[in-house]
A protein has these predicted regions:
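Glycine-/small-residue-enriched transmembrane alpha-helix faces in small-molecule transporters
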Residues: 1-50, 94, 139, 156-182, ...
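Hydrophobic alpha-helical transmembrane segments of multi-pass integral membrane proteins
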Residues: 19-23, 49-65, 137-140, 164, ...
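Loop-to-transmembrane-helix transition segments
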Residues: 19-27, 71-94, 160-169, 217-240, ...
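Helix-helix packing/entry segments at the starts of transmembrane helices
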Residues: 22, 54, 108-113, 180-199, ...
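Hydrophobic/small/kink-forming positions within alpha-helical transmembrane segments
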Residues: 32, 85, 89, 93, ...
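C-terminal-most transmembrane helix of multi-pass membrane proteins
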Residues: 56, 262-312
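C-terminal transmembrane-helix exit sites in multi-pass transporters
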Residues: 62, 67-70, 114-139, 266-286
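Hydrophobic transmembrane alpha-helices of multi-pass small-molecule transport proteins
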Residues: 63, 133-151, 283-302
Length: 312
């Protein structure tokens, strides 16, 4: 999938920089549609944070035979990146479960200031001074997020536990992206397996502390009824999209990664407007345009800088 577009041989960036960026854009867009099967699961009895648990545990169980086969053949079992797996898994769990404790709008805004944390972590851990275009993309991206979700003039300052969990989710995702850029994992299976394993552990621990808001455990009948769909979603959605998402930061950079994943908001907003009665007006159009422009700016300007470096 990473080989779809032209090979960028003239830059110091990954030779498939544009292809990976495009693949990440598609993966983020698919996550913007995930509310559709999520609603179906809720109607089937998988409510509250139980869907989040299933999204971690079931893909892990699917990958477990592969891990055992790798070990049998002399390769690593696959749990090679505990820090990355724990950080990214914690970010996803915090994001998903923050909706149980605070307003959706507040959770989205506080989580999606992720590009700010990524830039800060790049400065601290990678010693990267942000170039001028990063400030442009940050302004465009954050303005787009605020225009779409900030109808009440909400300034992203945490005011309750759900707000803090959403904020921490964004910080964890940013930290994991930078960690991936530093470690540059070889092969996708170890990082994917680590994500579902260590992220699953975090999700279960968090569920224990949030048990009062998790809702009652689904009945056995609900689990049995939903299991074919959960397996299908894991195989066709969770595994392929996370292959792209977890493989991207080490290849295109954590900063660009954190901008492109905002495309989830664009697709989610448009799809909700088309398929439901949710509002879609000038805020959604303008904010989505800002987010798309931010992604294009980061991709184009970053590549141009790399080309100029090679021509010096």
């Amino acid at each position: 999938f990473f080989l779809l577009y032209h090979k960028d041989v003239n830059t110091s960036r990954h030779p498939y920089h544009y292809s990976i960026s495009f693949a990440l854009l598609i993966a983020a867009g698919l996550w913007g549609l995930f509310w559709i099967p999520q609603r179906a699961l809720e109607s089937g009895g998988l409510t509250g944070g139980w869907a989040t648990i299933s999204q971690m545990v079931i893909p892990f169980l699917i990958l477990l035979p592969v891990a055992m086969w790798r070990k049998y053949k002399g390769s690593s079992f696959g749990l090679d990146y505990p820090v990355i797996g724990l950080l990214f898994g914690a970010g996803i769990a915090c994001y998903a479960n923050s909706f149980l404790l605070t307003d959706v709008v507040r959770a989205l805004i506080l989580f999606y200031i992720t590009p700010v944390w990524t830039t800060i972590f790049e400065m601290i851990f990678l010693r990267q001074v942000p170039r001028y275009y990063r400030y442009i993309t940050l302004i465009l991206a954050l303005s787009g997020v605020w225009i779409v979700f900030g109808q009440d003039g909400f300034i992203p300052i945490p005011q309750n536990s759900g707000d803090w969990i959403a904020l921490l989710g964004g910080i964890f995702i940013a930290a994991s992206a930078v960690r991936m850029e530093v470690k540059k994992p070889e092969g996708i299976f170890p990082i994917l397996f680590s994500f579902f394993f260590y992220g699953g552990i975090f999700t279960l621990v968090q569920a224990y502390f949030l048990r009062d808001v998790m809702g009652s455990a689904p009945s056995l009948d609900s689990w049995l009824t939903m299991m074919p769909w959960l397996l299908l979603i894991a195989i066709l959605f969770h595994l392929p999209t996370n292959v792209v998402i977890l493989g991207a930061p080490s290849r295109i950079g954590a900063g660009l990664f954190s901008i492109i994943i905002l495309f989830e908001i664009v697709v989610g907003t448009f799809s909700a407007a088309i398929l439901t009665d949710e509002l879609f007006g000038w805020r959604e159009i303008l904010g989505s345009s800002f987010i798309i422009l931010a992604g294009l700016t980061e991709i184009i300007f970053a590549s141009n800088v790399a080309i100029k470096k090679n021509n010096l």
